Amino acid sequence: MSGHNKWSTIKHKKGAADAKRGKIFTKLIKEITVAAKLGGGDPEGNPRLRTAIDKAKGENMPKDNIERAIKKGTGGMDGVVYEETTYEGYGPGGAAVLVEVMTDNRNRTVSDVRSIFTKCNGNMGESGCVSWMFDKKGLMVFPKSVDFDKLFEAAIEAGAEDVSDEEEQIEVTTDPVSFMEVRDTLEKAGFKPESAEVTMIPQTMVKLEGKQAENMLKLMDRMEDNDDVQNVYANFDISEEEMDKMM
């Protein structure tokens, strides 16, 4: 399994997604609001907004919530001002961790993030300490039922960098700039992804087991549970056998 999807697979197995739907909505509303503020309220001319709306629809967010978030971002409603930044550090076993936040109080957020690192046997580092271990890529995930050869041909012709046949899904990666163009081309050809986003993909993986694996999952859980944290990326790998021991 490719590393960037390890955490989402683990969350699915733990049944954590439904339990945290309220927090997911909060984070998505923030993302829609900021995307609309920075690039305007028309998703056709604002790729970041379009991606955020698609994610929200994928989580069954009501249309009214989406429209209110867009209106808030474009100045139609009063609201707080959010600042975006990324914190970096190391988790248990030296795993690299990137934490993307959107906050109205940087002092509060940096204190919270540092505390989570420390309590989970990790440590927060300086800016740039681990970001070089990740590549920013467009990622589209398709079900295994899709004809791989046809998708491969269409994706490469559309400008994708790679198409990989994973254990549970097919993944198409692109450079961030051409992500929306490749996605639109594939959708017009009849290939609709289950998920599509610009993400951070680790270049190498750190294998964890035992207490280190437990603490790493605790760190990821607590980071995602923080309202100011939008995304968490890490380069850890935990085997199926190790996961079974912890479940």
Curated annotation (Swiss-Prot):
SUPFAM superfamilies for this protein: YebC-like
Entry protein name: Probable transcriptional regulatory protein Gura_1416
GO biological process: regulation of DNA-templated transcription
Signal peptide feature range: none
GO cellular component: cytosol
PANTHER family: TRANSCRIPTIONAL REGULATORY PROTEIN YEBC-RELATED, TRANSLATIONAL ACTIVATOR OF CYTOCHROME C OXIDASE 1
Keyword line: Cytoplasm, DNA-binding, Transcription, Transcription regulation
Location, primary (coarse class): cytoplasm
Family classification: Belongs to the TACO1 family.
InterPro entries: Integrase-like_N, TACO1_YebC-like_2nd/3rd_dom, TACO1_YebC_N, Transcrip_reg_TACO1-like, Transcrip_reg_TACO1-like_dom3, YebC-like
Compartment(s): Cytoplasm
GO molecular function: DNA binding
Pfam families: TACO1_YebC_N, Transcrip_reg
High-level lineage: Bacteria, Pseudomonadati, Thermodesulfobacteriota, Desulfuromonadia, Geobacterales
